[in-house]
Amino acid sequence: MSTGAQTKAAAASQHADGPRLLADVGGTNARFALETGPGEITQIRVYPGAEYPTLTDAIRKYLKDAKIGRVNHAAIAIANPVDGDQVRMTNHNWSFSIEATRRALGFDTLLVVNDFTALAMALPGLTDAQRVQIGGGARRQNSVIGLMGPGTGLGVSGLIPADDRWIALGSEGGHATFAPMDEREDLVLQYARRKYPHVSFERVCAGPGMEIIYRALAARDKKRIAANVDTADIVERAHAGDALALEAVECFCAILGTFAGNLAVTLGALGGIYIGGGVVPKLGELFMRSPFRARFEAKGRFEAYLANIPTYLITAEYPAFLGVSAILAEQLSNRTGGASSAVFERIRQMRDALTPAERRVADLALNHPRSIINDPIVDIARKADVSQPTVIRFCRSLGCQGLSDFKLKLATGLTGTIPMSHSQVHLGDTATDFGAKVLDNTVSAILQLREHLNFEHVEQAIDILNNARRIEFYGLGNSNIVAQDAHYKFFRFGIPTIAYGDLYMQAASAALLGKGDVIVAVSKSGRAPELLRVLDVAMQAGAKVIAITSSNTPLAKRATVALETDHIEMRESQLSMISRILHLVMIDILAVGVAIRRAAPNAELAEAMARAKARAGASAGDEAADVLDWLSHGAAPAAKD
């Protein structure tokens, strides 16, 4: 973190896309900062969470106070598990959608990660001046590191070395069940059970846990204490020498040592255990003299093992900013450094060769890519201060057919910012929110399909379809829509095809199939027993089955080739939406594959196709090429006179 006047070197190292917003949001306070360049963290401000109705309100207040205009990228470390788009804080009343927050604040990128995952990413960069070793032990290089820290809650994480980088673990280990080690801790557990049905380590060795320990010990000694005594009061009394407060702190540190030892043996953390959070630093010498280290090593047969593992207290100021900055930098680097983002690199390479007007469109695409993707051409032209034809010329200068083609390529380069987890629709969502969630969920599912689809199976399926004597498409209920769409596409190849959505018709037709025939069975569940029996009959007669279904289903296991389309629906009881889209996409992939095969057929197939097309007065290759163009979102094939 830097202070003082900005040097020329610092100015040169500023982020090209502007300052980045960093946040560390806890149960009590929200801390914000700006990173103007790598390691240049400034304008740190702290806001009490209770004073703001929402996280968005707190961020807007910070941006206003910091007098910052546009921020493109932001990353938030939050004291809460982060699983999907919706975040509901455990130790505060804030609840928000990550994507809705990003849109409301106008960010291009908004990352939200667990605070201890962020803190973990800061550990490799800490210097000796930013940590204090507690007890003995020596850390082993390139070994697992453990992290814990009592604050409003008890955060837990870890770092695993992987080649030249570190992988941070997301964990809620603080909620592991508390296990007492002596009679005094038995008493604390019994007291806590009166209030909580499940007593986790977080209940007794997070900040509020010290109050529980203090009150449990007071009850043991039959001492009356004020109702408003909190952890800060207890720590202050302990520093002043109050016997009961000192015992509470001692007990607290011992329990913390037990938990740290558990974490060390669980992770095999030979790289050391680090202690963060806001409570322990306030204990000062009370912690250094406490039984923490002795309890850390007290693991019976593993005492020698733990004696060699060092424990450190983090003393760096605002270390979570360092970690969340590293995570954001890696995310943005992945976006711009991968093969999928070649369009960004091409824009940068071509920029100087563009006209001044086209250059303004290029700058808009680089700095605000979502604006290009989401806005109509009239808004893009207005924001870039150019004419609409200039926008089209810019796209063609990059080798794109037009604006739509450029938007598609640009979106591919932005996959790192598209949510890859499912966003739940909730009662009370506005049309903007639930509409965006439906679209995001669909896009996310398609991207995941692209990442996990077995393309060897796709090639096998295309070969089977291309050589089929007859193709029948079977789908029940909602899947019948997909079957009908497939029939509409494939009958144009000159192969006899039909689609059935009725079990009786499927059974009757399947009984007539044999070698050379193919059934494409479309099913979300892949478990309908009647459909499975129909397919068994056809396969026993020599027909082949291509299944478009979920993985590890009876249908996937029975099929000649399975094309697996796993996904998450919002509710099992409602009409399948995402699965239908994925199944339609699979049909498009298969149809394009067959069209490509038939656009350049071998001699034997060409002769067969020519005979099939003779009555239509079209050559096989021309017809297949027309269909390929149509499937590729070009013009529909012209009707033959």
UniProtKB/Swiss-Prot annotation:
Keyword Nucleotide-binding set for record: yes
E.C. number(s) listed in UniProt? 2.7.1.2
Biological processes per GO annotation:
glycolytic process
- Which positions, given as ranges, span the membrane? 576-596
Which reaction equations make up its catalytic activity?
Answer: D-glucose + ATP = D-glucose 6-phosphate + ADP + H(+)
Record's bilayer topology term: Single-pass membrane protein
The record's listing under CDD domains reads: ASKHA_NBD_GLK, SIS_RpiR
Q: Which residues bind DNA?
A: 377-396
Protein name stated in the entry: Bifunctional protein glk
* Species of provenance: Burkholderia pseudomallei (strain K96243)
